[in-house]
Amino acid sequence: MKSFIKLFFKTIITLAALAMLAYFGWKYAIPKLEQKESKQNEVKRNELKQDELKQSQRYPVKKIYDGDTFEAEIDGKNEKIRMLGIDTPEKHQSSKLDKDSERTGRDKETIKKLGELAYKYVVKLIGNKRVVLLAEPNGDDRDRYGRLLRYVYLEDGTFVNLKIVEDGYANAYRRFNLSKQNEFIEAERRARENKRGLWGDLKGLEFMEKQGK
């Protein structure tokens, strides 16, 4: 009888231990699975499909002006490209810098320093590389300054515009209704929550929100 009771309690303890292992295993496994799935979805949004990539022409990047504007050689001619859907702090003296400073109360030198950081990030990302340029469907081909308005992709499919926002070096530009605007807004939210890039200790992008874009 004693051996039966002993075996009974040993079985109960074993089952309880297995139940606890199963509970805590699922408790910690599910968030990891969700995190992995979220990361996979982020990568999927951040890349051009391989079949589209193979059919697209590549253009060499010749010069980078700031965090959202660069020059590429197209059909033997250098063209200025303004990346769609994003906006970075101004790096150079300009009327926009004056307006940004007046509107936000941030001094010009601080804004330019933030713009320099965004510029250096983009130089590292696309400098001396070849890129794929895609226009916004049913959108304007050029802006009022004559710059081509484009979505930009690296040869490995990386969506440059989105990556700049995801890494915290640009805001989502909200003034125009673009086909990929929701992706940019969501990327900005993630960058801010994770304090990436200029959303970190510098809090460099927060002043941009006051512009009402």
Segments (PLM) and residue ranges:
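Residue-level signal for secondary-structure boundary elements
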Residues: L134, A172, R196-W199
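Conserved beta-structured recognition patch
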Residues: R144-N194
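Hydrophobic single-pass membrane-insertion segments
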Residues: Y23-E37
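Electropositive
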Residues: K39-E166
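Residue-level "edge-of-site" marker
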Residues: G139, N177, G204
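Extended substrate/cofactor- or partner-recognition/assembly subdomains adjacent to catalytic sites
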Residues: Q181-K213
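N-terminal Sec-pathway targeting helices
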Residues: M1-A17
